């Protein structure tokens, strides 16, 4: 029973990783896989420039 749960959990994590990578590849199909994520293609990426501009505006 313990082995079955471990195998199912591992398969679930593998599927999550596979579909997550597929979604990122579909968002930016011409991206270089070695270069890392493209912030323009990844809607969940942190936009540091916007945060810096907001902080600058807020602080004066």
Swiss-Prot record:
What family classification does the UniProt entry report for this protein?
Answer: Belongs to the MCD family. Mastoparan subfamily.
Keywords attached to this Swiss-Prot or TrEMBL record, sorted alphabetically, are: Amidation, Antibiotic, Antimicrobial, G-protein coupled receptor impairing toxin, Immunity, Innate immunity, Membrane, Repeat, Secreted, Signal, Target cell membrane, Target membrane, Toxin
Q: Provide the function of this protein.
A: Antimicrobial and mast cell degranulating peptide. Has broad spectrum antibacterial activity against both Gram-positive and Gram-negative bacteria (S.aureus MIC=24-32 ug/ml, S.xylosus MIC=2 ug/ml, S.alactolyticus MIC=16 ug/ml, C.koseri MIC=4 ug/ml, E.coli MIC=8 ug/ml, K.pneumoniae MIC=32 ug/ml, P.aerugiosa MIC=128 ug/ml, S.choleraesuis MIC=16 ug/ml, S.typhimurium MIC=32 ug/ml, V.parahamelytics MIC=32 ug/ml). Affects membrane permeability of E.coli. Shows hemolytic activities on sheep, chicken and human erythrocytes.
PTM Leucine amide: list the residues.
Answer: 59
Q: Which GO terms describe its biological process?
A: defense response to bacterium; innate immune response
Any one GO cellular component localisation term in the record: membrane
Which residue intervals correspond to the AXPX repeats? Answer: 27-30, 31-34, 35-38, 41-44
Q: Any idea what this protein is called?
A: Mastoparan-D
> Propeptide residue numbers?
28-45
For molecular function, the Gene Ontology terms on record are: toxin activity
Q: Where in the cell is it found?
A: Secreted; Target cell membrane
Which tissue types show expression of this protein? Expressed by the venom gland.
Signal peptide limits: 1-27
